[in-house]
C-alpha cells in the first residue's frame, strides 16, 4: 500500500469536516452566548492540523492501487467519525464516549438516530454541526475529496468507481469523470431549493438551513424535539415529503430532466417501481391509521401515511407523529419499507429499490427458464441487458444485507435488547433510517440502549453507508497480510 497517497487523501477528507467546524464557530459567535464555542474551536484546530499535516510533510503521489482506494474510503469515513465526535465529547452534557461516537456516526452515515432526549438543549453551534455531518455524509466524505482531484487524474477515476455504486450508473449515461460533478450539482440544487421553501413556509433561517442539510442527505436530524411535528404546518409537511422523495431519486435522472428539459428520464423502470412501492405502502398505512380509531381523521391518516412512508423508504426518518401510538400493522410496515429504500445514485441507504427490482426480474427470468428450459432469458433494466456477471454482485449484496441483520440481531439480543426492538433497530441502522420501535421510535431516543447495543448499531450504520463490500475488502486485506 502507498501510505503517502492514503494519508494525503484521508487528510483532504478531514479538511471537509474542519471547514464545517469553522462554520459552526461562526454560528457560535453569531449567537453570542454559545456554550460550545470552546469545544468547536478546539475540535476545528485538532481536525485542521491533522488534515493539513500530510500536505506539509508527505510528498504528492498520483499512483493509486485498488487496495489504496479501499483504504482511503474506509479510513476517510472512520477518521471522520473520530474527529466528528470531538465537538460533542468536549462539550459534555449527555455525551459519553459511546454517545458522542453514536451521534457522530449517525450524522455522517445520514441515519439520524440520536441519543439525545432533549435536542433543544444543544447550543446553536452543535445543532448546526449535527446537521453539517448529514450534509458531509450525504454527499460522501470521499466525494468531497473527489471534487478537488483533477478530472484527468487516474486516482479520481478509480475512487469514483469504488465510492459510486455501479447501480447508480445504470440510470443515465455520462462520462465517469463527470459523475461526481453531476451528483454535487444536484445535491447543492436540492439543498438551496429546500432552504428557500422551508424559509418561505415559516421556518427561521437557522431552522431552514439545518433541515435543508438534513433532508437533502435523507438524514433526519432536526433542531426540534418533535422533529417536523414541532412546526405544526401542512405546508412544511408537504415540502418535506417532496424533498425527501427528490433526495431519494437517482440524481442522474434529476440532472438529465433539468439539463434536457425533458420528462423522458421519468420513464425509468426503477423509478416507476419505486414510486409504485410508495403509493401502495402509503395507501396501506393510511387505511391502517384510520382503522385505529377516531384520533386519526381521514386527512390526518393520509398525511401521516404519505409522510412516514416517504420518510422511511427514503431513509430520512423525519416524523410528524409518534409511531408508538400507531396500530401494530402500520409500525411494522414502516420497518419493512426501510429495507428496499430509495434508488441507487441518491443519498439513501438500504438495499436500494434498484436491487429489489433486479431481484424480482431475475426471479421472473428463472421461472420462465423452468417453464421453458430451451429459451434464452435475459434480465432487462429499461433498454439495458444485464449479464450474469453484472447481476450477481447485487444479489449477493442482498444476501449479505440479511446475513448482517441476522448477526446484528443475535448480538443485540445478547446485549439485553428484546427481539422485536433488536430487529427494528438493526434494520433501521443498517438501512440508515434512524427511527425504530418503542423508546427508539419516531420521536424517541437511543439513549436507553445498552452500550453494547449502541456499538452494534454504530457498526451497522457504517456498514450500511459504505454498502458492506469495502469493509469486507479491507478485512480481507488485513487477513491476507497477516497470513503472509
Show the residue positions of the predicted features.
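Membrane-proximal intracellular helices of multi-pass ion channels
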Residues: 1-484
Amino acid at each position: 500500500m502507498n501510505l503517502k497517497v492514503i494519508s494525503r487523501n484521508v487528510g483532504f477528507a478531514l479538511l471537509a469536516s474542519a471547514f464545517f467546524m469553522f462554520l459552526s464557530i461562526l454560528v457560535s459567535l453569531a449567537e453570542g452566548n454559545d456554550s460550545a464555542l470552546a469545544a468547536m474551536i478546539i475540535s476545528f484546530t485538532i481536525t485542521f492540523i491533522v488534515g493539513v499535516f500530510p500536505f506539509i510533510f508527505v510528498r504528492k503521489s498520483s499512483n493509486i492501487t485498488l487496495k489504496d482506494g479501499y483504504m482511503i474510503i474506509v479510513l476517510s469515513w472512520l477518521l471522520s467519525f473520530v474527529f466528528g465526535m470531538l465537538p460533542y465529547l468536549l462539550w459534555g452534557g449527555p455525551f459519553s464516549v459511546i454517545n458522542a461516537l453514536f451521534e457522530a456516526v449517525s450524522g455522517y452515515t445520514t441515519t439520524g438516530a440520536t441519543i439525545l432526549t432533549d435536542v433543544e438543549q444543544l447550543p446553536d453551534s452543535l445543532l448546526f454541526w449535527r446537521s453539517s455531518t448529514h450534509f458531509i455524509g450525504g454527499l460522501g466524505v470521499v466525494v468531497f475529496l473527489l471534487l478537488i482531484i483533477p478530472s484527468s487524474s487516474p486516482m479520481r477515476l478509480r475512487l469514483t468507481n469504488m465510492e459510486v455504486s455501479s447501480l447508480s450508473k445504470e440510470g443515465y449515461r455520462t462520462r465517469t469523470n463527470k459523475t461526481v460533478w453531476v451528483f454535487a450539482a444536484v445535491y447543492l440544487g436540492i439543498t438551496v431549493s429546500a432552504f428557500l421553501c422551508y424559509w418561505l413556509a415559516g421556518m427561521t433561517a437557522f431552522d431552514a438551513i439545518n433541515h435543508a442539510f438534513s433532508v437533502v442527505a435523507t438524514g433526519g436530524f432536526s433542531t426540534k424535539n418533535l422533529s417536523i411535528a414541532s412546526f405544526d404546518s401542512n405546508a412544511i409537511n408537504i415540502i418535506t415529503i417532496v424533498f425527501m422523495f427528490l433526495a431519494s431519486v437517482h440524481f442522474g435522472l434529476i440532472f438529465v430532466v433539468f439539463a434536457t428539459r425533458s420528462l423522458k428520464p421519468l420513464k425509468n423502470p426503477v423509478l416507476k417501481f419505486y414510486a409504485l412501492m410508495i403509493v401502495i405502502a402509503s395507501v396501506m398505512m393510511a387505511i391502517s391509521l384510520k382503522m385505529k380509531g377516531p384520533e386519526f381523521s381521514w386527512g390526518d391518516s393520509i398525511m401521516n401515511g404519505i409522510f412516514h412512508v416517504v420518510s422511511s423508504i427514503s431513509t430520512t426518518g423525519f416524523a410528524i407523529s409518534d409511531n408508538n401510538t400507531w396500530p401494530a400493522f402500520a409500525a411494522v410496515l414502516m420497518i419493512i419499507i426501510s429495507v428496499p429504500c430509495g434508488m441507487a445514485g441518491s443519498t439513501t441507504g438500504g438495499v436500494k429499490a434498484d436491487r429489489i427490482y433486479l431481484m424480482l426480474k431475475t426471479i421472473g427470468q428463472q421461472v420462465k427458464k423452468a417453464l421453458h428450459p430451451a429459451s434464452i432469458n435475459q434480465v432487462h433494466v429499461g433498454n439495458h441487458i444485464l449479464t450474469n456477471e453484472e447481476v450477481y454482485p447485487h444479489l449477493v449484496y442482498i444476501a449479505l444485507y440479511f446475513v448482517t441483520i441476522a448477526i446484528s440481531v443475535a448480538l443485540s439480543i445478547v446485549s439485553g435488547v428484546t427481539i422485536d426492538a433488536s430487529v427494528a433497530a438493526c434494520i433501521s441502522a443498517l438501512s440508515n433510517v434512524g427511527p425504530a420501535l418503542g423508546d427508539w421510535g419516531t420521536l424517541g431516543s437511543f439513549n436507553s440502549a445498552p452500550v453494547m447495543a449502541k456499538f452494534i448499531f454504530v457498526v451497522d450504520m457504517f456498514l450500511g453507508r459504505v454498502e458492506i463490500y469495502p469493509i469486507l475488502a479491507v478485512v480481507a486485506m488485513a487477513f491476507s497480510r497477516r497470513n503472509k
